[in-house]
């Protein structure tokens, strides 16, 4: 009987899980059309689009997503995309502020304040997404070994609400940036040639940055990892080349020291030979003189011996 109840319970849970996954996967997204409408190709919008696509993948709550949610990989990726979005948004806002110089100070301050508020709301919503995923990871870890179906359903609902808030705040931010840009255009149309001259390089720089960011957006994570690997490999090869060059320098220094030592040894040998020659020149005359004196002494002794040995003549005849 217990086995039968267990089988029924497993079948019921599996059916619930299949229904939840089907509901998540087949959920209509009417906001996609609106998303494509406000995306005009600005750098911050491209970065936000990458954040949006990654969040959509997380919202599927597939097995891979659930596995990675138990680690900090998903939140790290989302935070990196969030930082990139805010960085690009700040850069775009700075460019527009440079173009708003001819506008009245009061108008510029009001526009800047409204834009900062919209930017803060967008950042807070993106931070809420990361915080909700961290909370979900903690709850799942606390319920280890138990059913987490209710947590998944609740997380899916929160993510849907957060995505709608993100879309609304992004749309509001885009409209305020359009007002900002219109103010810059109005200032340029007042005949300030200096502003016109500055707008040309800024627009070209924006196109270059948008093209660069757009190309990076199309690269999958694997290609980026390969690019990082290539840069790391090039760095290692550079370090190896420097090490080999350093070893060659050490070898050259050792060879130079060896040559100097051999040269010094040769000089010492030459000095010893010269000193030996000087000693020989000092003592050789003395030896020759002693040899001559000895030879003379020998001759004298021989002469004396010969004289004493001669016969004495006799007087008897």
From Swiss-Prot:
Effect of residue 64 to H: Confirmed at protein level
Region (8 X 22 AA approximate tandem repeats): 80-255
UniProt-annotated glycosylation sites, renumbered to this chain: 26, 36, 93, 212, 307-308, 314
Disease per record: Hyperlipoproteinemia 3: A disorder characterized by the accumulation of intermediate-density lipoprotein particles (IDL or broad-beta-lipoprotein) rich in cholesterol. Clinical features include xanthomas, yellowish lipid deposits in the palmar crease, or less specific on tendons and on elbows. The disorder rarely manifests before the third decade in men. In women, it is usually expressed only after the menopause.
Keywords linked to the UniProt accession: Alzheimer disease, Amyloidosis, Cholesterol metabolism, Chylomicron, Disease variant, Endosome, Extracellular matrix, Glycation, Glycoprotein, HDL, Heparin-binding, Host-virus interaction, Hyperlipidemia, Lipid metabolism, Lipid transport, Lipid-binding, Neurodegeneration, Oxidation, Phosphoprotein, Repeat, Secreted, Signal, Steroid metabolism, Sterol metabolism, Transport, VLDL
Outcome of substituting residue 154 to C: In HLPP3; ApoE2-type
Phenotype for residue 79 to T: Changes the plasma lipoprotein distribution of ApoE4 to the HDL
Ranges for region Lipid-binding and lipoprotein association: 210-290
Annotated signal peptide: 1-18
Result when mutating residue 164 to E: In HLPP3; ApoE1 Harrisburg; decreased binding to LDL receptor; probable dominant negative effect; decreased in vitro binding to heparin
Subcellular location: Secreted; Secreted, Extracellular space; Secreted, Extracellular space, Extracellular matrix; Extracellular vesicle
Mutagenesis or variant effect for residue 170 to P: In ApoE3*; decreased binding to LDL receptor
Impact when changing residue 246 to C: In ApoE2 Dunedin
Annotated effect of mutating residue 145 to D: Found in a patient with hypercholesterolemia; uncertain significance; ApoE1 Weisgraber
Biological processes per GO annotation: acylglycerol homeostasis; AMPA glutamate receptor clustering; amyloid precursor protein metabolic process; artery morphogenesis; cellular response to lipoprotein particle stimulus; cholesterol catabolic process; cholesterol efflux; cholesterol homeostasis
Binding-site residues, heparin: 162-165, 229-236
Gene3D superfamilies with a match to the protein in the record: Apolipoprotein (1.20.120.20)
Effect of residue 161 to A: Decreased binding to LDL receptor
UniProt organism field: Homo sapiens
Disulphide connectivity of cysteines: none
GO terms under cellular component: blood microparticle; chylomicron; chylomicron remnant; clathrin-coated endocytic vesicle membrane; collagen-containing extracellular matrix; cytoplasm; dendrite; discoidal high-density lipoprotein particle
PANTHER family the UniProt entry points to: APOLIPOPROTEIN (PTHR18976), APOLIPOPROTEIN E (PTHR18976:SF2)
Protein name: Apolipoprotein E
Function: APOE is an apolipoprotein, a protein associating with lipid particles, that mainly functions in lipoprotein-mediated lipid transport between organs via the plasma and interstitial fluids. APOE is a core component of plasma lipoproteins and is involved in their production, conversion and clearance. Apolipoproteins are amphipathic molecules that interact both with lipids of the lipoprotein particle core and the aqueous environment of the plasma.
Post-translational modification: APOE exists as multiple glycosylated and sialylated glycoforms within cells and in plasma. The extent of glycosylation and sialylation are tissue and context specific. Plasma APOE undergoes desialylation and is less glycosylated and sialylated than the cellular form. Glycosylation is not required for proper expression and secretion. O-glycosylated with core 1 or possibly core 8 glycans. Thr-307 and Ser-314 are minor glycosylation sites compared to Ser-308.
């Amino acid at each position: 009987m217990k086995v039968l109840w267990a089988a029924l319970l497993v079948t019921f849970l599996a059916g619930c899980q299949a229904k939840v996954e089907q509901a998540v996967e087949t959920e209509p997204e009417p906001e996609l059309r609106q998303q494509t409408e406000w995306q005009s190709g600005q750098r911050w919008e491209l970065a936000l689009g990458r954040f949006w696509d990654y969040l959509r993948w997380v919202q599927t709550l597939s097995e891979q997503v659930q596995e990675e949610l138990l680690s900090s990989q998903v939140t790290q990726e989302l935070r990196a995309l969030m930082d990139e979005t805010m960085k690009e948004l700040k850069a775009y806002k700075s460019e527009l502020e440079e173009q708003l110089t001819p506008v009245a100070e009061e108008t510029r301050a009001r526009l800047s304040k409204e834009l900062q508020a919209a930017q803060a709301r967008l950042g807070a919503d993106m931070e809420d997404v990361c915080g909700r995923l961290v909370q979900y990871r903690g709850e799942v870890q606390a319920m280890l070994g138990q059913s987490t179906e209710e947590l998944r359903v609740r997380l899916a609902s929160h993510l849907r609400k957060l995505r709608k808030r993100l879309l609304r705040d992004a749309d509001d931010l885009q409209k305020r940036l359009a007002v900002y840009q219109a103010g810059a255009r109005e200032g340029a149309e007042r005949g300030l040639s200096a502003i016109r001259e500055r707008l040309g390089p800024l627009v070209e720089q924006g196109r270059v940055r948008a093209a660069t960011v757009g190309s990076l957006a199309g690269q999958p994570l694997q290609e980026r990892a390969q690019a990082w690997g290539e840069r790391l490999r090039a760095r290692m090869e550079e370090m190896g080349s420097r090490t080999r060059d350093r070893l060659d320098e050490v070898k050259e220094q050792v060879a130079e020291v060896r040559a100097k030592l051999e040269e010094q040894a040769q000089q010492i040998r030459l000095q010893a030979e010269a000193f030996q020659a000087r000693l020989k020149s000092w003592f050789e005359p003395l030896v020759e003189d002693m040899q001559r004196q000895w030879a003379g002494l020998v001759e004298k002794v021989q002469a004396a011996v010969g004289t004493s040995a001669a016969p004495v003549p006799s007087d008897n005849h």
